[in-house]
Curated annotation (Swiss-Prot):
Signal peptide (from-to): 1-16
Active site feature: 78
Main function: Hydrolyzes inulin-type beta-(2,1)-fructans. May play a role as a beta-(2,1)-trimmer during graminan biosynthesis.
Entry EC number(s): 3.2.1.153
Name of this protein: Fructan 1-exohydrolase
Species, as recorded: Hordeum vulgare (Barley)
Biological process annotations from GO: carbohydrate metabolic process
Amino acid sequence: MAQAWAFLLLPALALASYASHLLLPAYITTPLCGGGDGARSFFLCAQAPKDQDQDPSPASTMYKTAFHFQPAKNWMNDPSGPMYFNGIYHEFYQYNLNGPIFGDIVWGHSVSTDLVNWIGLEPALVRDTPSDIDGCWTGSVTILPGGKPVIIYTGGNIDQHQTQNIAFPKNRSDPYLREWIKAANNPVLRPDEPGMNVIEFRDPTTGWIGPDGHWRMAVGGELNGYSAALLYKSEDFLNWTKVDHPPYSHNGSNMWECPDFFAALPGNNGGLDLSAAIPQGAKHALKMSVDSVDKYMIGVYDLQRDAFVPDNVVDDRRLWLRMDYGTFYASKSFFDSKKGRRIVWGWSGETDSPSDDLAKGWAGLHTIPRTIWLAADGKQLLQWPVEEIESLRTNEINHQGLELNKGDLFEIKEVDAFQADVEIDFELASIDEAEPFDPSWLLDPEKHCGEAGASVPGGIGPFGLVILASDNMDEHTEVYFRVYKSQEKYMVLMCSDLRRSSLRPGLEKPAYGGFFEFDLAKERKISLRTLIDRSAVESFGGGGRVCITSRVYPAVLANVGRAHIYAFNNGNAMVRVPQLSAWTMRKAQVNVEKGWSAI
């Protein structure tokens, strides 16, 4: 069991006397916690602090995000059917009209012109027919020929069996598409074939057109004990026939929720429209939500056999690729025809307690929408926040030419530490001190982040950011890298360690982490971007190779209203920072109940 580690500030006079010998004129580092030999390190092995005896009011609005998508109140979960249509972005989502806990699910609906500011509308779909009386659950939107959007969604029927249902906009001339009419022949799909699990049949994908001109879509399900994305065909999007075989299945995993299937060209950050012809050289991504995380495979879609063939067949699902290594689930992507890109959202649930959610009156949010594309080598997906989010940046702070030696902290001042966007490049002065990589770490990178935390010095790293830090450092979150040398390549571990993120009791405070390959022999810079939005933190490492979403609830946010951000290095090798930029993020207008009535 790994110990918890703490920052510990030296007294002010000790800091002043020690800082006088530092030879870094461009900035001042804050060295913390020294050994008897005079060497300084900002980490000190310590017992984990006790949780506060008195909870600092979890109902505080301080934990409500300023620029993430969430309703004004109550429970939300999966993104459902995001789309761009006639100049408007639509975000549908699983929503409980009646409270901040799961249940009574309908389709919430919001619209935007910029993916940043959102108008909340009345629910698009409610539970009012026999085929969805138990809930209007996750689904997708497909744009049919002639510019006709159609929703296909999972409904829970009166027997609590899961069915697939269709709805069309009542008035396509309404720019907001406020009202939707359910098809008379709903449900269009039932789990009534032999071997199908009637309560594990949900979350239809966006449709795509095959070489025969017929529509296809996939639905998450269980068939004869196998987890699969079940495949269906239709000529008119109303009458569907199950294809004999799923495009891909696996017998060693739990049911695949929220499947997503899309094409991408290696190295091209433009998206591909599934309703159009797929160009030569394109690959496909098959994503599934399983084991409480979103995983995916890259491969080739065999059009003749309607089969997905992964580039690498991996039986151990712990080694499957991950969309995000943190609190991120049920993601849904769509093709943005306005800018020719693919955008993905994920649901980030709360990691405080249900009683906290009841007190707050809200639970759940969606991650910042991300552009998603296939890396040039065709091996993995890359993600980056959409450029529109940068419109909220203000009060830019820049630093160049920093050098971080072992134990150095550099405070990033003059930005709001609770609402910030930080971009930093780390340049390795040497790669000779990289420690050997153990391939078994790939099975559980979170465990390795916990055992080799930021307080444990390494050869190269840990280096990164300390965010949401209280004055005395008894609360802080660490986002950082470690570099390892494999036989023929370098492996970078990215961690987001929440174990000391809050003194509040009853919280989940894990150490998240994931590995990515990096050609450090050619490129010595590793980038990190972290967006801090009160209780939501999203970090993107190595240009989007690893993404980690974290939910944090520091007491300092509710009690003090002041926190700090630092860049740090605790590795033996010196790390340069050629560029550091940070911004305060303004508050977006997101589903406010009053005060914003038009786009």
